[in-house]
């Protein structure tokens, strides 16, 4: 028998997107480890042909295994989070049936291009992750992930000297492309910038209200 939710507010659904290798899974791991003592969390990962990101999160101990669900999309990653999000909407329903009092449902998309966005039916807040190793030109290339996401994370800033990228240029371009929309620069693997991301989620998602 399905349990009923006892909390007055619905769970916050946070979509995490970005290109392959940008650090989405690492960000999700770090968020779960930092927030799990204060909030009831579950996570859903997307891969095209495997459940590798689910495995990585489980092995890292981000959350108990039963709180992490892997989805095999079998096709274009952005279709499963935008045009036909039914497979992920079903996954959210299944996780909430198991954990009806979840405060946050994290949904990590499969690696995709700068045009990827989440359906508003699937995600309340969207975080888009790019990385410095992709080149300082990435922010000014635009695309919905850069310009429309609720929060842009420019990750792996520690690699800038090794790839010849100017953090000042990336910051300036991000401001031009995003206007008033916020962005964070850091290296989530080392924890740099993580607190800013968490504060954004708590503030914009009205957690604890």
Swiss-Prot record:
Function: Facilitates the functional incorporation of the urease nickel metallocenter. This process requires GTP hydrolysis, probably effectuated by UreG.
Residues engaged in binding GTP: 18-25
Name listed for the protein in its UniProt record: Urease accessory protein UreG
GO molecular function terms attached to this record: GTP binding; GTPase activity; nickel cation binding
Family per record: Belongs to the SIMIBI class G3E GTPase family. UreG subfamily.
GO CC, any one term: cytoplasm
GO biological process: one example: urea catabolic process
One Pfam family, short name: cobW
Source species taxonomy: Bacteria, Pseudomonadati, Pseudomonadota, Betaproteobacteria, Burkholderiales
Main location: cytoplasm
Subunit relationships: Homodimer. UreD, UreF and UreG form a complex that acts as a GTP-hydrolysis-dependent molecular chaperone, activating the urease apoprotein by helping to assemble the nickel containing metallocenter of UreC. The UreE protein probably delivers the nickel.
Gene: ureG
Cell location: Cytoplasm
Cystine bridges: none
InterPro entries tied to this protein: CobW/HypB/UreG_nucleotide-bd (IPR003495), P-loop_NTPase (IPR027417), UreG (IPR004400)
Keywords: Chaperone, Cytoplasm, GTP-binding, Nickel insertion, Nucleotide-binding
């Amino acid at each position: 028998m399905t349990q009923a939710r006892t909390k007055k507010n619905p769970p916050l659904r946070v979509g995490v997107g970005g290109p392959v290798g940008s650090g989405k899974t690492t960000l999700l791991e770090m968020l779960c480890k930092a927030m799990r003592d204060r909030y009831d969390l579950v996570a859903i990962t997307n891969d095209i042909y495997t459940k590798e990101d689910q495995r990585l999160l489980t092995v890292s101990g981000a959350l108990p295994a039963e709180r992490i669900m892997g989805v095999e999309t079998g096709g274009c990653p952005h279709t499963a989070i935008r045009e036909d999000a039914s497979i992920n909407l079903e996954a959210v329903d299944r996780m909430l049936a198991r954990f009806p009092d979840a405060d946050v449902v994290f949904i990590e998309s499969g690696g995709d291009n700068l045009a990827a966005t989440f359906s508003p039916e699937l995600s309340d807040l969207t975080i888009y992750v790019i990385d410095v190793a992709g080149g300082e030109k990435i922010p000014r290339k635009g695309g919905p992930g850069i310009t429309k996401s609720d929060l842009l994370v420019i990750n792996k800033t520690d690699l800038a000297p090794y790839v010849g990228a100017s953090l000042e240029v990336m910051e300036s371009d991000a401001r031009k492309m995003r206007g008033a929309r916020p962005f964070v620069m850091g290296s989530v693997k080392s924890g740099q910038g993580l607190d800013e991301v968490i504060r954004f989620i708590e503030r914009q998602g009205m957690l604890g209200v």
